[in-house]
Amino acid sequence: MENVLKNDWGPLLAPEFEKEYYRKLAGFLKEEYSTHVVYPKKEDIFNALEYTSYENTKVVILGQDPYHGPNQAHGLSFSVQPGIKTPPSLLNMYKELRDEYGYDIPNNGYLVKWAEQGVLLLNTVLTVRQGEANSHKGKGWEHFTDRVIELLNEREKPVIFILWGRHAQAKKKLITNTKHHIIESVHPSPLSARRGFFGSKPYSKVNTILANMGEREIDWEIPNL
């Protein structure tokens, strides 16, 4: 679990890979991957950072931990691999997108198109044991992903943080630079979406902010596969 980051995240996060917490985490993961089924695949763990460089990050959508079913997780929060049924929270995200922009709900949950446009799809925990939600919570990933948020907070160029639900909103304390923007609501989960996610218009809010900054807006439409 060494620093495999090829883009500008590599030098920024290099000190983390040398820290005691990360060494313990790496040892834990080595054991987990050899004795259990763990998601995502090792080579996909850092995909959020690989697809969306530090310099190119415009938006952060913060998730919790990866999907724990077969072939779902591939290192991007909320996203699933092609050919996999769209999970309920993502389906609600698509419904809100349809209500905002009139886009048809796509036949897949593959969000790489967002990541390639500067939407950092970051989970706070980057691995999970099959069938056991939150099984890698408290093992060290939170220190690592907090550092990612802190580094973005230090950036001069504003970032838009989308915080859905209490877990994501707990990270607000790391976002102290007033240049940045925070968009928050309840989580898109079926348990809470009707209590304020639907109608919150996060996607058009993002694009309004980007337009006001003179930045290219995000094309949120996910194509059918």
UniProtKB/Swiss-Prot annotation:
GO cellular component assignments: cytoplasm
Alphabetical list of Gene3D superfamilies matching this protein: Uracil-DNA glycosylase-like domain
CDD domains tied to this protein: UDG-F1-like
SUPFAM superfamilies according to UniProt: Uracil-DNA glycosylase-like
InterPro entries membership: UDG_fam1, Ura-DNA_Glyclase_AS, Uracil-DNA_glycosylase-like, Uracil-DNA_glycosylase-like_sf
Keywords of the record: Cytoplasm, DNA damage, DNA repair, Hydrolase
Catalyzed chemical reaction(s): Hydrolyzes single-stranded DNA or mismatched double-stranded DNA and polynucleotides, releasing free uracil
Single biological process term from Gene Ontology: base-excision repair, AP site formation via deaminated base removal
Pfam families membership: UDG
Molecular-function GO terms, alphabetical: uracil DNA N-glycosylase activity
Keyword Zinc in annotation: no
Subcellular location: Cytoplasm
Leading EC class: hydrolase
Catalytic activity, EC: 3.2.2.27
Active site per the UniProt annotation: 65
Annotated function: Excises uracil residues from the DNA which can arise as a result of misincorporation of dUMP residues by DNA polymerase or due to deamination of cytosine.
Similarity comment: Belongs to the uracil-DNA glycosylase (UDG) superfamily. UNG family.
HAMAP family the record matches: UDG
NCBIfam families in UniProt: PRK05254.1-1 (NF003588), PRK05254.1-2 (NF003589), PRK05254.1-4 (NF003591), PRK05254.1-5 (NF003592), ung (TIGR00628)
Name by which UniProt lists this protein: Uracil-DNA glycosylase
Protein's organism: Bacillus cereus (strain ATCC 10987 / NRS 248)
Gene assigned in the entry: ung
